[in-house]
Design a protein with these regions (language model features):
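Bateman/CBS regulatory modules and CBS-like beta-alpha motifs in cytosolic regions of diverse proteins
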Residues: 1-26, 32, 38-45, 70-123, ...
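Short beta->alpha transition motifs characteristic of CBS
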Residues: 32, 44-61, 126-127, 140-158
């Protein structure tokens, strides 16, 4: 099985000029955690999602924790008002201003083998990966794949059928 067997095509996308507020609204309305950002030709530019949005709303002091745990944030005097202020600062800015530029964004291709896909999803900090067709310097977005797609692929592909032979099903318990 490869990524093309389980990926979601025809995904919702953002333009680089779309605002953070628009992105948040679309994520909420469509119940998705990540939205790929593409140019006018459908070429992949980056990914904007809830993880990035959460990072933008954190107090600056929280970003300087380094190796310390986020559970140590109780000392910050931040209130919802300050978070609202940070939201108003970024809401009307384009998502292109906040795409991850420092790290290499992980992606897969339609032909990525299932074991490699599992490893990429495990390595990724996001809950989904863009599926890209790479031709030279261009990266054409053709879909997205998530942990839920993998789960559905395992169940629908009966990959676990043999592993459960002779075991009672959940329906029989």
């Amino acid at each position: 099985m490869t990524t093309k067997n389980i990926m979601t095509s025809g995904v919702y996308t953002l333009k680089p000029t779309d605002t953070v507020a628009h992105a948040m609204s679309l994520m909420h309305k469509k119940h998705v955690r990540n939205l790929p950002v593409v140019d006018s030709k459908g070429m992949f530019i980056g990914l904007f999602g809830l993880r990035r949005l959460s990072h933008l709303l954190l107090p600056i002091a929280a970003l300087d924790l380094g190796e310390h745990s986020l559970s140590e944030l109780h000392f910050l005097p931040d209130e919802i008002v300050q978070m609202g202020d940070r939201w108003h600062e970024i809401a009307n800015q384009p998502v292109s201003d906040f795409l991850e530029k420092k790290k290499k964004l992980l992606f897969c291709t339609p032909d990525t083998a299932f074991p490699e896909l599992l490893a990429l999803l495990d390595e990724s900090k996001d809950s989904s990966l863009p599926v890209i067709v790479v031709e030279g310097d261009t990266k054409q977005l053709v879909g997205m794949v998530s942990g839920w797609d993998v789960l559905e692929g395992i169940i629908m592909g009966n990959l676990i059928k043999g592993a459960n032979a002779g075991q009672p099903s959940a329906d029989n318990e």
